[in-house]
Amino acid sequence: MSDTLVCFDSNLQRNVVVKTLKPGIEKQRLMDELSALADIRSKYVVQVLDVIKKDGDVVGFVEEYIDGNAITPIANPASSDTILRYLYSIAAGISDVHDHGRLHRDIKPENMRFDYGGTLKIFDFGLSKLNTSAKTKTLYFTPGYSPPEIFSAGVDGNHNFTEAVDVFSFGVTAYWILNGGSIPADFFKVPPIVPPTSSLFDALAVVSEKSVSVLLDSCLCAEPSNRPAMREVKSLLGDYILKGQHKMLLTYNGQRSTIDINKPNVSLTVGSNGISISYNGLGFVVSNVTGFVRINNKQVAAGHRIKGSVVIVLGDPSGGIKTSITADVSHPEVMH
């Protein structure tokens, strides 16, 4: 699609990548990549540094040079934390792409690399599209990493792409990482043969957290609507990386108490109204409710997960009995 050259930027005092359009290549693909990278701000996505113009026309751009190692399969045995952090970086990058209304459309190991500081970066957005325009009559795909639905054109002759395409490609990439660089032979067929539900990650038995294996397997579902959103994958992986590190601060009448891994359970009661909250290492969950209880003015039931800052009300205000308790949940960050 483009000619790529590594150059030294004397102003930035570092190497950069210069991408210019190859003769005879569709300019729109270069513009799609530039547009995508200019829109997205993420520590896990390569950044555009400058635009190159000739006679007022864009002919190329400058992006950061990723000078670290290519991604490789994880050598077994590996710690659960190593696996979770590896996959989290990829999931977070794709999630950020989707949060900016973009699709990557070519997620695979070759399009990722670690920078000098060890942060994984996703690059090569030449096939990237806005969610609202992610369709094409000409099908570009990478064998092994593309889901079955893109091989069937719609009545308008277009091949339609959704976020679920990137989710499937993430699932294959994750499997490649955990399975010694190998993926199922059926995935290379055109179209790929994908079972309705996957148990590939569960069979690997390298991820100790069952819910993580289940979620990763769901990324490889044949039906796109059964695949999770990347922000859901990012969230669960992050929760397990930070397991046991969360805190909830409860404040009532100037008095404070904390729920954390050392004190994981609390019960708050006013008359016949009460709520029990438990910390399971991943988050704070309502375990029991009696009488009139509201969280941020909404009725709550057992199983509800409390996030952020909320106000817990015990007692019906119309009955003259009301106690308000503030709850603040900490937001620890995944550090590399």
Feature locations, PLM:
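ATP-binding glycine-rich loop module of kinase domains
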Residues: D3, C7-K27
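AlphaC helix of the eukaryotic protein kinase fold
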Residues: I25-D39
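Short beta-strand micro-motifs within the conserved protein kinase catalytic domain, predominantly
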Residues: Q47-V59
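Conserved short submotifs of the Hanks-type protein kinase catalytic core
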Residues: G56-N69
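Activation segment signature within eukaryotic-like protein kinase domains
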Residues: Y86-L87
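Catalytic-loop of the protein kinase fold
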Residues: H98-F114
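Conserved activation segment of eukaryotic-like protein kinases, specifically the C-terminal portion
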Residues: K137-A153
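Terminal C-lobe "cap" of eukaryotic-type protein kinase domains
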Residues: C221-H246
